[in-house]
C-alpha cells in the first residue's frame, strides 16, 4: 500500500508514486521516507508495478503481520475483533472477478476491469433487453472502488457461492458481449443507463 500526503507534486501522480516506491524499497525496515524534492524524470507507476494477478481472500486480516506478531495476545485479540466485523466473502468458481458475500442478505459483487462507461453501457443494453439477471437474482446497483466499477446483484435468500458458478458462467458471455458492443445506445437503453447511474455510489 502506497499513499502520499504532500504539498509538492510534479503534476504526474504516476511518476511521483513510482519514485516513492523505488526510494521506499531501499529503506531499512521501520524507517520513514522523507521527501524534500520533486522526482527527476524516470519510471512511472505502470513501469514498476507488475500487472495484477490472482486476488487472494483471507479469513483474518493478519497477512500484513509476521507470524510472530500475529501470535501476540494483544494482536490476536485485535485480529479476531476485526474478523468479526468483516463481510463473509467467497470467490465464485470460474467467474473472474465475481465474489459472493453475505450481509443481511446474500449478494454477488462483480468487479469489472473494463472502462466505467463501457460497463454502464453494457448493463444498460441488457436491462433494456430484459436480460439483466441470472438464477433469480436482482440487480441492485453498482459502486466504484479504486477506479473500477462493481455491479451488485441480490441473490435469493440463503444462496451459497457454489450455487452461482453455473448460472453466472452462462450469463458472463452475455455481459461481456454487451460491454464490448460499440453501437450507440437506443433511447430505451439510454433511459436504462440513467437509472443504473442514479444508483451508483463511490467508495473512497
Model feature map: region roles:
Residues 122-142:
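Short acidic, Pro/Gly- and aromatic-enriched capping/linker segments at domain boundaries
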Residues 136-137, 142-204:
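Alpha-helical oligomerization segments
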